[in-house]
């Protein structure tokens, strides 16, 4: 609704604004990767909303990328629970999803995933920043790849591509794409020495 209103205020017809806004929001939040218009030319408000939606991702259990909606819900509920515990120290409340309590181990694993995601994200943005491109390009390039979105903003917008990056930056982006598609930990496990040691031991 906000994007539609912003586009209408930018002299776009309501029907076209609603169609483009609905399609781009749906495409980004489901990590489809399509673009029917150069949304990089939209207002700062629209672009900010689209960037935020890049991190939400698809539903739990789907093949879409991103952090997944369920993880965000658990994260918000965890923050609310911690805030309430400061206000009411003696209260005992459990985090619930669909009316069922979530085990502490599940909450811990989600928190670890989100922390790992942010570490990889920040490290990737820092790694490709040495080429001297603007922050919007670097930030959305990593956001678009690690969340399997497709196009980003600025130099990696819908009308552009990632071909101008150096080979090193492309390797970083490739890693982010694999991490976003395969999930973080299955990919990181491949780099653990114990996995390779066990593999070579079995061959011998």
Model-predicted regions and their roles:
Residues 1-204:
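Membrane-proximal intracellular helices of multi-pass ion channels
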């Amino acid at each position: 609704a906000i994007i539609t209103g912003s586009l209408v205020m930018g002299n776009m017809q309501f029907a076209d604004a609603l169609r483009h806004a609905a399609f781009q929001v749906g495409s980004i939040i489901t990590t489809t990767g399509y673009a029917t218009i150069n949304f990089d030319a939209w207002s700062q408000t629209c672009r900010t909303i689209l960037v935020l939606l890049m991190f939400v991702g698809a539903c739990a259990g789907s093949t879409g990328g991103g952090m997944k909606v369920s993880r965000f819900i658990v994260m918000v509920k965890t923050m609310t629970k911690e805030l309430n515990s400061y206000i009411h120290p003696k209260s005992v409340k459990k985090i619930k999803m669909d009316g069922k309590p979530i085990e502490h181990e599940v909450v811990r694993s989600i928190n670890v995933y989100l922390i790992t995601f942010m570490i990889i994200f920040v490290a990737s943005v820092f790694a490709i920043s040495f080429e001297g491109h603007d922050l919007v390009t670097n930030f959305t390039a990593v956001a678009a790849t690690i969340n399997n979105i497709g196009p980003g903003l600025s130099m990696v917008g819908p009308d552009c591509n990632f071909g101008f990056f150096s080979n090193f930056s492309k390797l970083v982006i490739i890693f982010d794409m694999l991490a976003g598609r395969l999930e973080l930990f299955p990919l990181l496990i491949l780099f653990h020495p114990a996995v390779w040691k066990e593999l070579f031991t079995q061959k011998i």
